Amino acid sequence: MNLQHHFLIAMPALQDPIFRRSVVYICEHNQNGAMGIIVNKPLENLQIEGILEKLKITPESRDSAIRLDKAVMLGGPLAEDRGFILHTPPSRFASSIRISDNTVITTSRDVLETLGTQQQPSDVLVALGYASWDKGQLEQELLDNAWLTAPADLNILFKTPIAERWREAAKLIGIDILTMPGVAGHA
């Protein structure tokens, strides 16, 4: 089972403050573990334009029609001072890894320098931090009913309002997560 380019959808019983009602986009999953970005936990009072200002990035060819007031996500509890940019191709940036045909993750400054210009990728999600699981840890959490899984959907990843992503991700597999009981059992 490889969950790269899938969503992890927190079950209602998962009460960890970081992962409660979260949707995690899995960027890498292999025999050594998994790495992902939470895509529905906005950081308070931090938007893309604030990140660019803090890093003193002011593109010369700024296009005022491109909005930079999108929220920056808390990508996870690890390396919260490090930026991760999920975006649609191209992957021409210095530190890009293609996750799927339609999704790339970049950690280099050059992608930030394109934001707000005609050169930026068409869809962008900026996060600080990431989540990871050691070998076998995610599989055990799945057996413990901590998560649902669904193939990733770019509309949910990039276009669905943040507050609706948890519910919409569960709908991908036919579940209305708001009607689920808080504790799951084993059959």
UniProtKB/Swiss-Prot annotation:
Report the GO terms under cellular component.
Answer: cytosol
Q: Which domain of life is it from?
A: Bacteria
One Pfam family, short name: DUF179
Q: Which family does it belong to?
A: Belongs to the UPF0301 (AlgH) family.
Q: Which PANTHER family match?
A: UNCHARACTERIZED PROTEIN YQGE, UPF0301 PROTEIN YQGE
Q: What is this protein called?
A: UPF0301 protein YqgE
